[in-house]
Amino acid sequence: MKKPLGKIVASTALLISVAFSSSIASAAEEAKEKYLIGFNEQEAVSEFVEQIEANDDVAILSEEEEVEIELLHEFETIPVLSVELSPEDVDALELDPTISYIEEDAEVTTMAQSVPWGISRVQAPAAHNRGLTGSGVKVAVLDTGISTHPDLNIRGGASFVPGEPSTQDGNGHGTHVAGTIAALNNSIGVLGVAPSAELYAVKVLGASGSGSVSSIAQGLEWAGNNGMHVANLSLGSPSPSATLEQAVNSATSRGVLVVAASGNSGAGSISYPARYANAMAVGATDQNNNRASFSQYGAGLDIVAPGVNVQSTYPGSTYASLNGTSMATPHVAGVAALVKQKNPSWSNVQIRNHLKNTATGLGNTNLYGSGLVNAEAATR
């Protein structure tokens, strides 16, 4: 999450909807909201979709009850549907034995050539001197998009934000994150941790800096389907989501190292998705290697990285200094890319464990996890 000279707090404004209809009585259509329906198995998803498509967006629950559903997205790798319903119909649908859960499609927000201090602090130049710059490693930036910039080489991507088909960044957050990962070594601007890594702009947050769980889950699915080695998620929410956890697990099972921001509220608990076991949770430190006051901590924190006054790329071919665990997370994603280049046969789990084992200990593991990510030690 981005903290531009102030505090940006992860929020969960909810975007949900449902519509109730009956074969006996018809009332004025209720306002619809967005939900995620999780099924026990993939076959049940297909059968459910076939039924609502055959009945003009209506699920028939019994002879006397129907539920009007608008299908928004069918996930390929997890048994989940993104739909619009009226809230009154949720209880009726939950009685279907093939449905595991129904949850609101909650909103998730950003956690918001000189060599920036953070790049030096994680000792990335030492790895560069060994010829390790992230070459051949694919890093997906699940964020607000990435703007065209002379200091960035964007290889591709996709947008999962309704109404924003372009992967260009209308906020600034994603472009800043991308620069910390892979700003080019081109004698201008700033230098990234892994300047030769392949950047992919996966837009899951809109210009406002927020987005839905379904968009983020689709972004993770895209990362798994397109052979990404690392996925940077500088975003979070205080609320759990079964769909988002499944998406993290699915991406991890397909070889993606999911690196996520711990959150910016300063609380002694980690935000989601960073709190999930298969996500690598990253906290923020300042120039004195102390925990940044805003950085969330606690059980499940894996590692820390610089997150205060971080200078990086910004839209309009400019540069900006921002604060946040969002700024810390791409330092870790970048070091992961360096390790992957050096050890191309290593799995995401091996890379995650290696980053933790080679981190510089800073004391209290509740505050710092395994310590400060260390590119020099990780690439020896």
Swiss-Prot record:
GO terms for molecular function: metal ion binding; serine-type endopeptidase activity. Its EC number is 3.4.21.-. GO terms for cellular component: extracellular region. Residues 28-111 form a propeptide. The active site is at 143 (charge relay system), 173 (charge relay system), 326 (charge relay system). Ca(2+) 1 binds at residues 113, 151, 184, 186, 188, 190. It holds the Pfam family Peptidase_S8. Monomer. This is M-protease. It comes from Shouchella clausii (strain KSM-K16). The gene is aprE.
